[in-house]
Amino acid sequence: MAITNGSCPSLGFIYCAILADPRNPESIWAATPSTTRGQPTQLSSDAKGERLAYASNKSIFLRSIDNPAIARQYTEHKVQTTVARFSPSGFYVASGDSSGIVRVWDCVGEGITKGEYSIVNGRINDLAWDGDSQRIIAVGDGKQRYGHCISWDSGNTVGEISGHTQQINSVSIRQQRPLRAAAVGDDKALIFYHGAPFKFNMGVRDKHTNYIYGTSFSPDGSTLVSVGADRKIWLYDGKTGETKGQIGEGEHKGSIFAVSWAKDSRKFVTASADKTVKIWDVEAGKVTQAWNIGGEGNTNVQDQQVGVVWPQGRSDNLLISLSLSGDLNYLVEGTPEPRQIIQGHQKNITSLTTYGSSSGEETLWTGSFDGRVCSWDVATGTAEEIEGDRHSTYIAGLTPTQEGAGRIYSVAWDDTIRSVDVGAKTYTGSSSKLSGQPKGIATSNNTILVASSDNIELLKDGQKQGEFKAKFSVTAVAAHENVAAIGGDDSTVQICDVSGSSLTPKTDIKVSRNPVSALAFSCDGSHLAVGDSRGRILVYKVADGSLVNDRWTAHTSRVTSIAWNEDGNRVVSGALDTNIFVWSLSNPGDWLQVSNAHKEGVNGVAWIAGGSKIASAGADAAVKVWQVEGLK
């Protein structure tokens, strides 16, 4: 959706535009699913096999399976989301969160919430729809109860989920009549229910010897399967609940976290902590194909398989598994290697920069709270995680240089600076210890400036060349050619000349009464934009430090990122207030606004596509692209 200009008469001379529906930018490059070691993560696909639904941070993402760069985000949950399931009709999604709330919402229209229901006073672990798309059973960890059955439109009780003594991990409803349901949990029990209304029928407590993580009825309703931490797979009659037997003893070498059926009900797939995904023939009770994610002998815990779905309605035999790292693995039956691996961020994106190659290829680079750095192809919206010896925690800044074939330097709260080879998409292997926790990073003619609270370190090829002791506590740094700007918590900006291994103070600017939080030079270096902790943005001439504009005050909290377009007339800013503003230097009273661009805050903004679009990243771990129109 384009951001367009419009009039706001109540503001007199000020003209602004507000994006009517911020949930529909031109593109959403979605966060990957949130995962927790030792817990299953639920994946769901719609009846046509076109979209994937999953929980990530406090959002739910609906993602195109064939084009993962196309996604939709639901942001009405107030706390960490845990599960999302499409209704069989395909018109609605039910999603749960860590506070025990289930929300039902429209997934084909405007995303309007149709109902909000309190199920348990704890985490929702799973939920299931009946075949009529009328009833929902939601289960999890509570105090008074571990699950509840409701009608989706009214929340009225349509049964009782009883029989469990510990949290329920998974639930499934038979899609045919007579209605049946099954729930499994930490008490090693499978409870079978008759419905509707759903009520306890029988309990199976002597088959599994450890936590049961997953259960599912076959699409034709004939068979029920359960899997768990004891690495066992049990089959039951889908109508009566009677045990049919166990298959696959000893096949998996780790906990089995998830199970999903093929549409023909003759096969199902399992995902395990042993890093394998296996297809099973139900009648033969044997594995027909297995994938070892990461290869044989792989010891990377992040490759544990914690979720899987076999999308119905497709003819290409595609199934999708989830790694603990958040990677979505596209596996095709009959093909030994993954067809595709979808990568991205699971945690809050904390830094963003751009890199343009000599061949014209444009990439975005993002860093997140967990130390992950990803490269995004702007043309396709696909991400690639940078391989090698990565940071272990919060990425505080990224900056590009033209060294060699291109480098991206990153600094993080592990107090190190590392470099990435742009072409190879790998860390170069060199890292240097910093003198303190970094606040930001900038490039001045291939000299790297790293800001910490006490000083500015100057590095070349990743090696320290010198340092500059600031007269205030440093909060931000920016550079253009041989000029640097240093922002402080005393609301001062110091302009310095950069020469080799030293900085020479040139001009001091007292910008406001608030700490400086973001700095950006225009592309020709003539202007400097300064953002502060209260949401104000001011523009100064670099040559003499004179004020050019002080009218950009629409943000209501700390400005986190500022970027100029190539002609130096427009500025984009992002802040913790979740909003993005595009400002005009030639018409300071003319702006564009995107409200609620990123849930819980915008942390990075950049111009792409020759200045016709904006890329943004934020606390929701997503990257979004916005079309800009109407600003002069």
Mark where each language-model region is.
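WD40-repeat beta-propellers
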Residues: 60-64, 102-106, 147-152, 190-195, ...
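Loop/turn segments within WD40 beta-propeller blades
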Residues: 43-49, 85-90, 128-134, 171-179, ...
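WD40/WD-repeat beta-propeller blade N-cap
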Residues: 32-39, 75-81, 117-124, 162-168, ...
